[in-house]
């Protein structure tokens, strides 16, 4: 398992995520990790074109709309036993 910094600069207003540290097996898996997929209100999944959509088919306003808009930087190896997902996210509350 590896650690990555993911970031975006598409949606930069208030109530948006600008970056997150994620644990993933690959750069692509990191790129496809949504910073807040543990929300009890809304969960996003990638559609066949690489766009995040919620259960109503809406795109997120708080993160990049498409996985291709996400930058990924390798940080290092995760500690043994680390599970994939978001470790820490940066949210700009309004």
List each language-model region with its residue ranges:
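Short beta-strand element of the conserved SAM-dependent methyltransferase core
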Residues: 4-6, 21-22, 43, 72
């Amino acid at each position: 398992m590896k650690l990555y910094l993911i970031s975006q600069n598409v949606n930069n207003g208030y109530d948006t995520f600008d970056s997150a540290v994620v644990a993933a097996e690959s750069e692509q898996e990191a790129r496809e990790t949504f910073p807040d997929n543990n929300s009890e209100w809304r969960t996003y999944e990638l559609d066949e074109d690489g766009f995040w959509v919620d259960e109503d088919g809406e795109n997120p306003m708080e993160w990049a709309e498409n996985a291709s808009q996400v930058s990924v930087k390798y940080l290092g190896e995760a500690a043994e036993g680390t599970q994939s997902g978001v470790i820490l996210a940066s949210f700009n509350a309004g």
